[in-house]
Regions:
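SH3/SH3-like beta-barrel fold
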Residues: 184-188
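N-terminal Rossmann-like dinucleotide/flavin-binding domain of flavoprotein oxidoreductases
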Residues: 23-68, 148-180, 197
Length: 278
C-alpha cells in the first residue's frame, strides 16, 4: 500500500510496530525451503525507501498517532492475530508464530492441527521436525494443503516425508487437556466420529488469523466513508467514492489480514485495488 501510494505521488507515513518491515513474511521465510520469501519484504522495503516513504519502525500507531498526522487517507494494514481453532481446551495450544519465532522449543512429540489448508501449518511441521521434534500433522480434509497449488504441495510433501512427519487426514481435534506429563489430545475421525486420546508435549493450532482491527474501529466514526468499501469498485479497481459521513476527517480503509485472513498474494491485491486510484 505504501509503495503504490508513494509511486502515485502521495506523501506517505508508514508506521510499523516492530523493528523491521515485513510482518508475517519474515516468519514464513524461516521455514525450511521458503527462505526466498524474504525477498518480497526486502524488495518492498527497498521500494518504499527509494520512493521517500517516511517509515517509522518500533511505533505502534493508535488513534492519537493517526489524528496527530492529520491524514487525508488512512490505510489500516495492522495484520491479524493467530487463531488456533475452536476446540475444548484451545487455550492450551500454541500458534505457528510461536514456533517460527522461536518462542517455544521444538522437541519431543508435537501435534499440528491444520484447519486452514495453507502454507502455515505445513511450514511449521517442517520447521519443528528439522529442529529435532517428532511431528504429527492432522487435517479434517482428505489431503493436506487444500488451498495450495500442486507445485507448492510437491515441495511441501518432499520435505514432510524427508523429515518423517506423520500425516493423519480426515481427523479433527476435539479436546485438549493438561496432564502431568504433557497434553492429552482427543482426536476424532470426521466420518465415523470415533475418537482416541494421544499424548503430546506441544500442540499447535492453525486456523488462519482473526483481524487485528481495534485501530480501524476506533477511527471508523471519524472517517468520511465510515470505513466502508464499495466492493464492486474494489474488484474493478475503480476509485472509492462512498462518503456517508461528509463531515469526517479522512477516508479509511483496511486491507489484508486486518480485514480477513489472507495469503500474501491476496493481501497485496487488496492494497493495489484500494490504493491504485487514490
Amino acid at each position: 500500500a505504501a509503495r503504490v501510494c508513494a509511486s502515485r505521488g502521495h506523501q506517505v507515513i508508514l508506521y510499523e510496530a516492530t523493528a523491521d518491515l515485513g510482518g508475517q513474511v519474515v516468519l514464513a521465510a524461516k521455514a525450511t525451503w521458503r527462505a526466498g520469501l524474504i525477498g518480497i519484504a526486502t524488495w518492498l522495503a527497498d521500494q518504499v525507501a527509494f520512493l521517500g516513504v517516511d517509515v517509522r519502525c518500533n511505533q505502534l500507531a493508535d488513534q492519537n498517532t493517526v489524528l496527530e498526522s492529520d491524514p487525508d487517507v488512512v490505510i489500516v494494514a495492522s495484520g491479524g492475530i493467530p487463531n488456533v481453532g475452536r476446540f475444548e481446551g484451545n487455550g492450551l495450544a500454541n500458534t505457528v508464530w510461536d514456533v517460527l519465532a522461536g518462542h517455544v522449543e521444538c522437541n519431543g512429540q508435537i501435534l499440528i492441527v491444520d484447519e486452514s489448508g495453507g502454507h502455515a501449518a505445513l511450514s511449521c511441521a517442517e520447521f519443528a521436525a528439522d529442529h529435532g521434534a517428532q511431528v504429527e500433522i492432522i487435517s479434517p480434509d482428505k489431503v493436506l494443503g487444500t488451498e495450495l497449488a500442486q507445485t507448492n504441495m510437491g515441495a511441501h510433501m518432499n520435505e514432510l516425508y524427508k523429515l518423517k512427519v506423520r500425516i493423519r487426514p480426515d481427523t479433527r481435534l476435539e479436546k485438549l487437556e493438561r496432564e502431568d506429563d504433557g497434553l492429552t489430545a482427543t482426536l476424532a475421525n470426521v466420518y465415523t466420529d470415533l475418537n482416541e486420546d494421544h499424548r503430546f508435549d506441544l500442540v499447535i493450532g492453525e486456523h488462519g488469523t482473526l483481524p487485528n482491527s481495534d485501530l480501524y474501529f476506533a477511527l471508523k466514526p471519524l472517517s468520511t466513508n465510515l470505513g466502508q468499501l464499495d466492493l464492486e469498485s474494489l474488484t474493478a479497481a475503480w476509485s472509492q467514492t462512498l462518503a456517508p459521513n461528509p463531515e469526517g476527517r479522512f477516508s479509511l480503509y483496511r486491507i489484508g489480514d486486518a480485514w480477513a485472513s489472507r495469503n500474501i498474494h491476496a493481501a497485496m491485491l487488496d492494497a493495489m485495488r484500494v490504493c491504485l486510484h487514490l
